[in-house]
C-alpha cells in the first residue's frame, strides 16, 4: 500500500497504469488488493514452484501471472530481474504509467513498517516488549520494526529467524554470505542483502530447520486449531530460541504472516511431505 501510494503521489503511475512486481506470492496478493482499489493493472512475475493456492488467489484477484523457472538472484532468469526487465520493456507503453514496485530494494517498504507495524506492536504490548523476531523476504518488516521499536527502547533485542538455505544467518553471525541446506518455505530467506535489510538493526540470528518449523505449526493446528504456513513456523521457531536465550519474564513478539490454506497442496499434503522426507502429523 505505502509503495503504491508513494508512486501515485510522485506521479509515477495513475488509474489505468501498470504495476509490475516479482513476488513469491504474499506481497503480490497485497498488491492485487491495492491495484483493485486504485484501478491499476497488475502483472506478477512468480516462480512456477510456488504453491498453486497462492497463484490461484492472485488470479482470482485479477492479477496477470507470468510464471518463470526458479533461478538464483545471480541469474538473469531470476524472477525479480525478469520483472524489472518486463517493466523496462513496457515503459512508455501506457500513458498512465508503468511502475516496477521493487519491494526488495524500495525502502518505502521499511518506512511503512516503522509507521505501522512497529507502532502497533508497541501499543498492543503497552511497551512491555523485550524482543522481536522474524524471517526476511524483502527485509522490510524486520528493518522497519527494528528501527521503530529501538526508537522507543534501544534495549529491545531484535533477531533474525532464518530458514536453511538462506545466507543471512551467516551474514549476521559471521559477516559473510554463506549458506547450507535447503528449505521448502516460500518467500523467505535470501542470498543477498537487500536495500531494506541493510537498514535492519539486528542483534542476533537463529537458524530454524523445516523440521522444527513444521512440528511447530502442526502442533498449533492440533492443539489450538490455528492453521499457519511455513514462514510463520520459521518465525515462531526463532521466537522460541530468543525466549530460551533471554529466559523467563520476557515478552517476545513475532509475525504470523501466512495462513495455512495457501499451502494445502504442500505442507498439509501427506504425499508432498513424504516425498521430502519431512515430519508427518498423525492427523494427516
Name each model feature, range by range.
Residues 1-284:
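PLP-dependent amino-acid enzyme catalytic core
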Amino acid at each position: 500500500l505505502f509503495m503504491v501510494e508513494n508512486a501515485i503521489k510522485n506521479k509515477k503511475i495513475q488509474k489505468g497504469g501498470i504495476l509490475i512486481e516479482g513476488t513469491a506470492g504474499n506481497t503480490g496478493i497485497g498488491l492485487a488488493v491495492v491495484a483493485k482499489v486504485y484501478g491499476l493493472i497488475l502483472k506478477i512475475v512468480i516462480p512456477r514452484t510456488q504453491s498453486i493456492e497462492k497463484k490461484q488467489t492472485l488470479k482470482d484477484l485479477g492479477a496477470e501471472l507470468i510464471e518463470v523457472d526458479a533461478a538464483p538472484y545471480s541469474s538473469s532468469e531470476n524472477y525479480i530481474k525478469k520483472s524489472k526487465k518486463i517493466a523496462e520493456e513496457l515503459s512508455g507503453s501506457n500513458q498512465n504509467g508503468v511502475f516496477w514496485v521493487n519491494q526488495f530494494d524500495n525502502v518505502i517498504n521499511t518506512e511503512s513498517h516503522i509507521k505501522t507495524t512497529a507502532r502497533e506492536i508497541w501499543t498492543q504490548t503497552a511497551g512491555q516488549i523485550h524482543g522481536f523476531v522474524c524471517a526476511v523476504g524483502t527485509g522490510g518488516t524486520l528493518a522497519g520494526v527494528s528501527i521503530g521499536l529501538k526508537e522507543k527502547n534501544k534495549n529491545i533485542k531484535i533477531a533474525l529467524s532464518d530458514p536453511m538455505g538462506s545466507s543471512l544467518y551467516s551474514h549476521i553471525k559471521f559477516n559473510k554470505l554463506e549458506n547450507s541446506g535447503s528449505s521448502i518455505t516460500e518467500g523467505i530467506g535470501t542470498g543477498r542483502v537487500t536495500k531494506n535489510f541493510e537498514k535492519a538493526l539486528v542483534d542476533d540470528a537463529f537458524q530454524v530447520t523445516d523440521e522444527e518449523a513444521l512440528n511447530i505449526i502442526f502442533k498449533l493446528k492440533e492443539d489450538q486449531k490455528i492453521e499457519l504456513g511455513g514462514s510463520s513456523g520459521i518465525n515462531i521457531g526463532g521466537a522460541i530460541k530468543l525466549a530460551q536465550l533471554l529466559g523467563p519474564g520476557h515478552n517476545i513478539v513475532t509475525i504470523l504472516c501466512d495462513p495455512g490454506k495457501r499451502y494445502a497442496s504442500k505442507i498439509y499434503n501427506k504425499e508432498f511431505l513424504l516425498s521430502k522426507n519431512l515430519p508427518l502429523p498423525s492427523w494427516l
